Amino acid sequence: MTFFESELSAKKRDQRRGFLFILSSPSGAGKSTLSRLLLKDAQLERSVSVTTRQRRPSEVDGFHYHFVSKQEFECKRDGDEFIEWAEVHGNYYGTLRKSVENALSAGRDILFDIDYQGTEQLQKKMPGDTVSIFILPPSMKELILRLHRRAEDSQDIINLRLKNAQTEMQHWRFYDYVVINKDLNQSASLIKSIYLAETARRKRCSFLESFVDGLIDEKIN
């Protein structure tokens, strides 16, 4: 464990404000898989979005998403309960404001798996608290293969995702980092490195002032 990883222990986390670590990509570029790999060995908590999308057989309500009706979603939206929300592929997605604010205040870092619309909202509302990465496929041919390989969507849905991918990829320049996902393990390693580097930013580490003062005052025999 590195110095800054150890400083992110439960003892130190309450001494700094957390941040939002955002991954975006067109469907099939590997965003969800990379998110799962990152959560295994990085000190991140996953943001669980609220959605009106139909639950897939492999998904668990409350873990992958909070699945709600369109009426329930609109009620929460109109009540200003979302810090960000968007309509993607004909479905609503949103992030509950209270859960995010509580996590950041407690010094916890939150992983977001959201599209460019949600990212833009978070960047505007919380500019000092966001770190964003856009994930690109190595080619459109590979993107098509991945969508078919997933075997969880109908052909009509796949066609819609491919059409929307062209719009989504135009927003890459508004992100802090861009990763071309040619190799899953290499991409995961790169993204973890970006996360660890961001935890070491001086502005995030309020404990450093007292730590350095202690070093300076420490007696040398």
Curated annotation (Swiss-Prot):
Gene3D superfamilies: Guanylate Kinase phosphate binding domain, P-loop containing nucleotide triphosphate hydrolases. It comes from the Bacteria. InterPro entries: GK/Ca_channel_bsu, Guanylate_kin-like_dom, Guanylate_kinase, Guanylate_kinase_CS, P-loop_NTPase. The keyword Cytoplasm applies. Its EC number is 2.7.4.8. Belongs to the guanylate kinase family. This is Guanylate kinase. It comes from Bartonella quintana (strain Toulouse) (Rochalimaea quintana).
